[in-house]
């Protein structure tokens, strides 16, 4: 199984890179994990609605090029479904049973995701109503993907 994480923006903070690197290493026992960082668009200080839509549209074009035609796509969005780690683990296991070989997660930039990406997604997922920096969300999501594999394995990692 392959797990892709498509992210808008470059990760700069060393502690986040180190954390993600650790979980990538751990995930290598269960799947081929790939994190794809895409360039984000610069947002003007006084951007209006139309400016923001144009920025998200440009970012969506970059994202769309990285999504495989047969990928099962989960986009992170505040309006997405929320569920406990056990259910997330079942979801990941179930995707492979349905015949998908690649699960692609998408984390948008600071403005979020364009509607075209949300429509392409097989599922919208949310980690709650809290606003988190999208760079931090990469680490949280990577840990949860690892946790999902550990739950499936029956490991005491998830207590």
Swiss-Prot record:
Its main location: cytoplasm. S-adenosyl-L-methionine binds at residues 76, 108, 127-132. It is found in: Cytoplasm. It is an enzyme of class 2 (transferase). Gene3D superfamilies: 3.40.1280.10. The keyword Cell membrane does not apply. GO terms for cellular component: cytoplasm. Keywords: Cytoplasm, Methyltransferase, rRNA processing, S-adenosyl-L-methionine, Transferase. It catalyses: pseudouridine(1915) in 23S rRNA + S-adenosyl-L-methionine = N(3)-methylpseudouridine(1915) in 23S rRNA + S-adenosyl-L-homocysteine + H(+). Its EC number is 2.1.1.177. One of its GO terms (molecular function) is rRNA (pseudouridine-N3-)-methyltransferase activity. HAMAP family: 23SrRNA_methyltr_H. Specifically methylates the pseudouridine at position 1915 (m3Psi1915) in 23S rRNA. Homodimer. This is Ribosomal RNA large subunit methyltransferase H. It comes from Streptococcus pyogenes serotype M18 (strain MGAS8232).
């Amino acid at each position: 199984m392959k797990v892709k994480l498509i992210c808008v923006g470059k990760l700069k903070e060393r502690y986040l890179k180190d954390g993600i690197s650790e979980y990538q290493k751990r995930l290598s026992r269960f799947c081929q994990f790939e994190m794809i960082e895409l360039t984000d668009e610069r947002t003007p200080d006084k951007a209006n609605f139309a400016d923001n839509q144009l920025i998200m549209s440009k970012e969506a074009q970059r994202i769309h090029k990285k999504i495989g035609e047969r990928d099962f796509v989960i986009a992170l969005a505040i309006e997405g479904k929320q569920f406990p780690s056990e259910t997330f683990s079942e979801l990941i296991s179930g995707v492979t049973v349905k015949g998908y070989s690649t699960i692609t997660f998408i984390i948008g930039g600071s403005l979020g995701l364009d509607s075209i990406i949300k429509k392409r997604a097989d599922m919208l997922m949310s980690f709650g109503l809290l606003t988190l920096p999208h760079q931090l969300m990469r680490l949280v999501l990577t840990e949860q993907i690892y946790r999902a594999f550990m739950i499936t394995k029956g490991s005491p990692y998830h207590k």
